[in-house]
Each structure stands twice: as structure tokens, then as C-alpha cells.
């Protein structure tokens, strides 16, 4: 009897200690964060045999983009949170965001006007249902209230957000405001993820998260037109579905993650082959639009190699039968790189990144461009096909807490898959501040 009492008493003490530890760390009821990012890009003249409507301009160019975002959040009840993100954006991309499938500025996807524009980027509700396991403390961050959550949990997100907020994450290559800035490095370039011209959508996502694995699914709205700003309200007919499985592992005691993604988009997309059949010379894919499905998938791996060094790899594919609709004109992609913190040279918060990308097209897509067809981002009027290859490197200098300055270089071989144009070098500077 005394032994049972002692065990119960020890259990009571442990529970009290756990509660006391939780009391030492605050649980936020509301939060306010912000960011601003200024990116300037330059490329000089480069060789070209010809150009078309969607070509990268061969003469010298300098363009700048700016965004500023406010991240406001509030806890409604246990597990229930709401977030609002008003955003300011201004600027233009090189050549009007044309002429390179793996475009050079990941921030410009959110910029649709040279004038300063205020809009709502996100307004979403998140409900977390605890399923047990060790309690974890989550630090305060953008769109994340500080507090405790179960190691195993079910997370429901509903409203206006970005698909990239939830899917295809990567510790080393996902955020153009602080990491690599090429479009094909912020996510799987062959995933035509549902989004308006600013990179956001409406929809619902559900995540089952456990200590060693996670399963995610989402149903998201597509734009009404290719690369358009208004979303298609026919949600039962036009939408994008995505499923992702994530598995954590350790390689020689170093953490890593592998993610498998599959998607199917349903939208009013045209067919490359139908456009060619209707007009073998100068085909117009917009004349063949009807409700169609695009399918694809991707592999995403991240691996810590040392305390200050990590590596990543992505591979992506889609069927390439219907026109690119929401992101960019990439049907196959392979990318990989490394990220090194500056502790080895006395700059622990600095980051050096180097990555390579190889993008490709389906046979239908390349035949369409070779016949003089145009998409919403590439098309030189004719095509001497070659894979678009890009090398990107950046150095991020931590000035003070929250403020970083970056220098970025991108070398692009066969821009827009055309051996008759380029190569071209793009230099970028980035100023990023967050609180």
C-alpha cells in the first residue's frame, strides 16, 4: 500500500514540475510581427540570335521590388488561432517577369504593379487538436503564437494563405526573403501550385503531425485565368488538390527529412497538342481552353551535414500536356545545393548558399514553343531546345538582430530553354528586415 502511495506521490510531483516548467514559458494570446524586403537586380547585355514577345531583354536592365508585411495573430480559444497579413508591394521584375522559366526573383511573384499597392495577403483560421505525446513549446514567429502543443496533433487551416506556407517546406531552400531567390529554389518548380498572381490562394489544408512523420493534404482555389489575380469561384469544378508525406530520419546522428508530394490541378487550361493541331504555325493555346487536369509530383530532401552545414535536393515532374496555369513553365526540374553558416570565419549568423537547377519541358510543351506559341512567361517565337540550367549563390550578412544584407549571383544557361539565347548573368542585392 505504501509503495502505491509513493508511486502516486512521485507522479503528482512530476506533473507539478511539468506544469511549473510550462509556467516559466509564456503562452501568447496575440502577436505582431513584420518584415520588409528590397531586392534590386541587374543583368548586362547577352548574345541572342532572335527574340520574341516573352523574351528576356538582351540589353542592360536594372529592376527593383519591395514588399512589407504585417503578421498579426490572436488566440481565440484552446488550439484556435486567427491570423491576418496585410501586405504592401511595389516594383517590376526583369523584362516584366518574362524570358526565364526559373525566374530570378522569388519576391516578384507577389508584385503585380509598379505602384505601391496594399492588399490582404493572408486571412486564415488554424485549429490544432492535441493527440498526445510529449508537450512541445513553440517559439513565437511570423504567423505562429508562442505556446505548447502535443507532439502528435491534427492541424486544420482554413482561409486565405499560400500553399507554400504548408507544403514543400525545406530548411535550406524555401524563403526568398532570406535564402535563395530563384523561383525554382523556393519550391519544386514543376509543381504548378494553386495561387493568384501574388502567390496566395483560398482553401483548406489538414495536417496529421507526429514526432517521426507527417501527412498533409489540401484543396485550394485556382486562378480564373493563367497567372491571373482573380481566383476561380467554381470551387467544385476548378481547384488544386495536393498530398504530401514527410518522414524524419537520422544519418550518422544528423537529422534529415524526406518529403513526397503529389498533386492534381483542375482548371480551364488549354492543351499544347490541341493548339498545334488547330494551328501548326503560331499556335494559340488560349483557343483550346476547357476544364482539364494536370498531374505531377515531387521529391524533397534536406540533410544536416554538420552543425553549421546543410544540404538539400528537390526533383519534380508534371505531365506537361496542359498549359502552365499558376506558377511557371517548368515540367521537369532537378535542384540541389548547400547552406553554410559563417561560424567558421567568426560570423555565426551569416549564411553562404550555393545551388544548381536544371529545368526541362515535356515534348508537347517544347513543340508548342518551337512552332511560335507563347505561354505566360516564356516564348521567343521559335525554339532551339536545351535544358534551362541555373547556378545561384548568395551571401547573407547579419548586420544586427532582424536586419540582413545579401549579395546574390545567378548564371543562366539557355534562358527559356533556348540555346540561341544567352547565357546571362544576374546580380542581385537584398535588404531584409524583420521583427
Q: What annotation goes with each model-predicted range?
A:
Residues 21-32, 44-45, 73-82, 130-153, ...:
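Short loop/turn motifs that connect adjacent beta-strands in outer-membrane beta-barrel proteins
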Residues 30, 64-70, 119-123, 154, ...:
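Hydrophobic, lipid-facing positions within transmembrane beta-strands of outer-membrane proteins
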Residues 32, 36-40, 84-88, 156-160, ...:
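Transmembrane beta-barrel strands of outer-membrane/channel proteins
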Residues 74-76, 86, 127-129, 160, ...:
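Residue-level signature of outer-membrane beta-barrel architecture
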Residues 98-115, 119, 132-240, 244, ...:
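Surface-exposed coil loops of outer-membrane beta-barrel proteins
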Residues 121-134, 354, 423-435:
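Outer-membrane beta-barrel "beta-signal"
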Residues 246, 261-291, 319, 323-412:
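Outer membrane beta-barrel transmembrane domains
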